[in-house]
Regions:
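Short amphipathic alpha-helical face segments that pack within enzyme cores
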Residues: 115-123
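Histidine-centered catalytic micro-motifs
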Residues: 109-115, 147
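Preference for bulky hydrophobic residues occupying beta-strand positions
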Residues: 96-98, 147, 178, 194
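Hydrophobic beta-strand-centered segment that forms part of the acyl-chain substrate-binding groove
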Residues: 122-165
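HotDog/MaoC-like acyl-thioester-processing domains
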Residues: 15-61, 153-155, 160, 166-208
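Catalytic strand-loop segment that frames the active site of acyl-thioester-processing enzymes
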Residues: 60-111
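Hydrophobic alpha-helical topogenic segments used for membrane insertion/localization
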Residues: 2-22
């Protein structure tokens, strides 16, 4: 009797362990796959994908002088944006799906607030690169980002990050507003305003 009971208990424990492994694998798969809202937006023809070679081609990136991986778009990024799409109608808008991965964790189960700040910096910069109506990487730089953190982000979350041009001053200053939110329930996790400064070289090339 005892042997049979022990065997049954061992079998039950093994089944529970197998179920837990399956659940964890399923969660990892769900977390790794872009959400439906992003796939639906991405398929709309008015949204143009940014084609940025240094995000997509690690070998080319290394051979072109970069010494590491992209902080937000690299394969090992703690908060990763696979790509941005943009709409050049006024006001210019940029949208992406941000995956907050395990490496962004600070408080148990929650991501570090700095991960949201880094994301705001990134999308404000890339919105500035698109201000000419086409994506021109490294045609300027972000000089100011004011971020307000509202709601913590749980580890594993996929959130919508978006930005739009608010106004331009002269030929170089571009003021941009951005937001991080959950399209599923409308929760706004943070907002930001930033100043992007277009390079003198970009203006000289006539991309104003």
């Amino acid at each position: 009797m005892r042997a049979a009971a022990a065997a049954a208990a061992a079998a039950a424990a093994a089944a529970a362990a197998a179920a837990l492994v399956h659940l964890r694998r399923r969660r990892r798969l769900m977390h790794a796959c872009p959400p439906e809202w992003w796939l639906a937006l991405r398929s709309q023809p008015e949204w143009l994908p940014m084609r940025v070679r240094e995000w997509e081609d690690a070998a080319w990136r290394a051979s072109s002088g970069w010494v590491g991986v992209d902080f937000v778009h690299g394969a090992s990024a703690a908060v990763r944006v696979l790509e941005y799409v943009f709409k050049s109608d006024e006001p210019l808008q940029v949208v992406g799906a941000a995956h907050f991965r395990n490496g962004a964790e600070s408080h148990k189960g929650l991501c570090h607030g700095g991960s949201m700040c880094a994301l705001m910096d990134d999308i404000i910069g890339w919105t500035g690169f698109c201000v000419s109506g086409e994506c021109v990487p490294w045609s300027g730089f972000t000089v100011q980002v004011n971020t307000r953190l509202s709601v913590p982000v749980p580890v594993g979350a996929w959130l919508k990050v978006e930005a739009q041009v608010e106004r331009c001053e002269g030929k170089r200053k571009v003021w941009i507003r951005s937001k991080l939110s959950d399209p599923n329930d409308g929760t706004v996790h943070c907002t930001a305003e930033g100043l992007f400064l277009r390079s003198a070289e970009a203006n000289a090339r006539g991309t104003a």
